[in-house]
């Protein structure tokens, strides 16, 4: 078992108490192709829309998605947006919501209008009251929070300055948590870090850090110097400054700064990436990891989150694929077990703008001819899926004496190759059904076929894809190898 798997097992046993500003995130996707005749403003032709639990609610969703349990305390209004949020959170089996309703304020709601094609935000509309909660609501929040501290392994305060985390709530929660020996992570919004006094870790982004410290924060040394004064003011153990494409820097009260560069990734949407960082930091630290491990996990999770549209969560499988070197992934990670899993991987790759390739075969006894085709196929794409004939399919095509190796053994051999990203077993005589599902950008076969003989060529061509024929190596075929083995010749 890898260290990552051991960490995931520990995460599954942790509970995070998350408190913060809950909001409803709505995304309206469309395109602009004309200007309104009524006023000089663009007209968005809406194509689709979606809703997500946002703000501190997205932090809670990320905590649950990575495998931990989350007790979540937030504030909603007595309105449709609040009821929608309650229903959405109730669907999350690993989140225990304790929502306080304040009829005097609306539920925070943000509607973003986004270009479907370019993934750029064109407009945002907000419904909110950012004033602090009343003393009555403060008390109801504390009545919900304080009894849960004993159950939590770590506390996470997600401050969006929408009224939940008042100074009274912050001070009361941190003091109570410290008495119980619980660590507190704060994702701050206030430029006055002193109100978070006693927290274990503050996680401002660069803009928030500059505003609070009045420093340039252009280098690790700049951040380290300014953070020491800020930590003294906030009486915290460490400060982590996130810097988007420049990575993240952790400055401990005692010890050397740790900087983790950002992972290269095609950014589609940065909405909620900070939520993901805070959530992963909390669960990994609660699971017993050190600062450096927690930072690497958070950085990898952020890279996954920004490659998705909307307010996104990160799963353990996505985190594993981002953290572990490609060649280190276990064979079972590359062998697809269901159509739903295949669809999930494809969606993930396409969100990242990756070119997907496909080839297929029986691969009964892997030989240099196979390796040449697979290597060429991988060179023509960013991710290669290999369609593998099932045992029953091979018998129909090759006869009752085949395959020599069963489908699981053949799949594991293929999955061990660095050129192969996924192996999908199909039971039909041809991979046509699989190709229709994948719709690859490039379809690869050996040069002993003509373009018209390649199954699925018309599907790929219709989508503007490429059919690639690779010259075969003479003298290599599984059939001839089997015959030679039976004859005892080489």
Curated annotation (Swiss-Prot):
Keywords assigned by UniProt, alphabetized: ATP-binding, Carbohydrate metabolism, Kinase, Multifunctional enzyme, Nucleotide-binding, Nucleotidyltransferase, Transferase
EC assignment: 2.7.1.167, 2.7.7.70
Molecular function terms, GO-annotated: ATP binding; heptose 7-phosphate kinase activity; heptose-1-phosphate adenylyltransferase activity; phosphotransferase activity, alcohol group as acceptor
Region span, Cytidylyltransferase: 358-490
UniProt-annotated binding residues for ATP: 205-208
Residues annotated as the enzyme's active site: 275
NCBIfam families: cyt_tran_rel, rfaE_dom_I, rfaE_dom_II
Assembly and interaction partners: Homodimer.
Protein's UniProt name: Bifunctional protein HldE
